[in-house]
Amino acid sequence: MSNRWDSGVVRALAEARHGDAFAVLGAHPSDKGRLLRTYLPGADRVGAVLDDGQVVALDAGPEPGLFAGELPAHGGYRLRIGWPGGEQETADPYAFGPQLSDFDLHLISEGHHLQLADALGANVVEVEGVRGTRFAVWAPNASRVAVVGDFNSWDARRHPMRLRHQSGVWELFVPDVGPGAHYKYQLRGPHGHELPAKADPVARRAELAPGTASIVADPTPHQWSDDGWMATRARRQAHDAPMSIYEIHAGSWLREAGVDLDWDGLADRLIPYVADMGFTHVELMPVSEHPFGGSWGYQPLGLFAPTARFGTPDGFARFVDRCHREGIGVIVDWVPAHFPTDAHGLAHFDGTALYEHADPREGFHRDWNTLIYNHGRREVSGFLIASAMEFLQRYHVDGLRVDAVASMLYRDYSRNAGEWIPNIHGGRENYETIAFLRRLNEVVREHTPGAVMIAEESTAFPGVTAEVAHGGLGFHYKWNMGWMHDTLHYAGLDPIYRRYHHGELTFSMVYAYSERFVLPISHDEVVHGKGSLLGRMPGDDWQRFANLRAYLGFMFTHPGRKLLFMGCEFGQPTEWNHDAGLPWHLLDDPRHRGVQTLVRDLNRLYVQYPALHAHDDDPSGFAWVVGDDAGNSVVAFLRKGKRGDAPVLVVINFTPVVQHAYRIGVPQGGQWREVFNSDAGIYGGSNLGNGGSVTAEQQSMHGHAQSLPLLLPPLGAIVLTPYG
């Protein structure tokens, strides 16, 4: 039998470095019919079972595990393998032809395969009547790729893959491997050096950390029951609809006996709470698989796999489905800017800078010690866009909040002179990222109508929410970081000094209509030594709670969608700790319960009155009444809806001094109802107010023929609307 084996081939197979196993293994034409070769390290014997049941014993080769024998020129066969522990009969992986179509490979190469995980990754399929899993991975510079797993003792010699040369995709159909199998890819770089075993970049399921293997996902699709939600989603998420977002970290919203809830447990507890509180959406901090829990998900590696920390992918689908059935939208934080350097991940995936830039001046982020995606490479931008579509289409997610957009837009982001590479025109803008974001948002709008894309963008980059056709980036909304920074700084000042910083309260209206905004009080504002939202407020306990209530009243009546991080809705006094659950016991304290009740009522007020949301992006929806009373730290403004909607008057006193008969001009006479007062006793306030209503007097003020003499409670926000 020695003439059947070339010594160089034997050595390459034995050392797991043969780059074209299909040229050697499997059945190939011979003078006597077909010569079948197999390499099954650890096997004692191998036979070929022909279609008629005849068994052809294969002869052992020059290396343990090598077997060869002559078969008839035609007909199928199966392998009967004798292992030390028993016998196995299976199809030969090397009996099957190429798996992926040329069209699939073309789309992958062009970065246009929107269902990328249906082509790459691990897909349970049936080929020529045989069930198994097709593995496929993009690694164009690898000299050899093998799939290893619990089905082959993690032995890279067992299942070397086929290279589809023009695309750089390696593929192999492995019979009898099904859902639940753990696997990785074992690659050699372009010069033959062995690389760390890699998790599948396109895996739909991952092993629970600290494990790093990928898992063959169950192909059974989730049976959705959210048709009603999906049919009305576009209207529910339109620009003139209310959007109040409750941002959560799934692992620390509620911990019972120190244990994370799974998706079903979270749905049982979170969904009724969110519905009762009146939020329209939940926003999940990243749920893509990530190796380090302390990154809160913002350094993901499994961009197609919901993290195993909270259960299976179908568990995540059930969570979204249940949210939709209760009328709650689901937004997911998504990270296309950078990825961690973990050896099992994307870093130097095939021995080259494949997903990242090769030059650290473009490819390494020193702030986070992460690698930066090369958005200018078609396959990489296509990989990221397909990840977005995976969550939007497969999991019915209603929107993505795109993380760290500013870090992507500017080549000199957080870099000193000489530490970055200018664009082709010598500037700082990252043209490749701009093109990527525009295409991402165009694809989302075309293929998932009604879904929303939200940018966390902290600079004045123009046109973030302008349409791509008009030169914009195409996002639906942008976080208003300027409003957040200015107003939080103002709210943190002792009231005696606020008169000198009045502009921080009013400046946001100068640019309020330059973009479509979300007002974010996010997790970033309650970590890294910043303290809690309540902890930022000055004064004694009474003043701190009153300040918080007034600030929330200002937030919920200011133009822009709302986002509030978990714990802020009841005045958590300490910074958020991702290793612990929220301090729910504080709701036994009437002060914290009062803040929670206030947020619940603000959400209902915000949804109930179209004037508070219908014209968030239209200057006609807002008018200052009092914007210049810095001495008293008072602001007053009108919110207006569409024709026929009642106007809403908002007045906020940011000092602890009660203002008596503070006169505010209003556009119409008659009685005005006080529909909200942050100083109400039910919220923990002193119960000072206007007795439920005020009658306008014929005394001109602020450009109006009539006015209201109001009592402004200390550190209080009141909202009034005319009767009828």
From Swiss-Prot:
It catalyses: Transfers a segment of a (1->4)-alpha-D-glucan chain to a primary hydroxy group in a similar glucan chain. Gene3D superfamilies: Glycosidases, Golgi alpha-mannosidase II, Immunoglobulins. One of its GO terms (biological process) is glycogen biosynthetic process. GO terms for cellular component: cytosol. Pfam families: Alpha-amylase, Alpha-amylase_C, CBM_48, GlgB_N. Its EC number is 2.4.1.18. It comes from the Bacteria. Belongs to the glycosyl hydrolase 13 family. GlgB subfamily. This is 1,4-alpha-glucan branching enzyme GlgB 1.
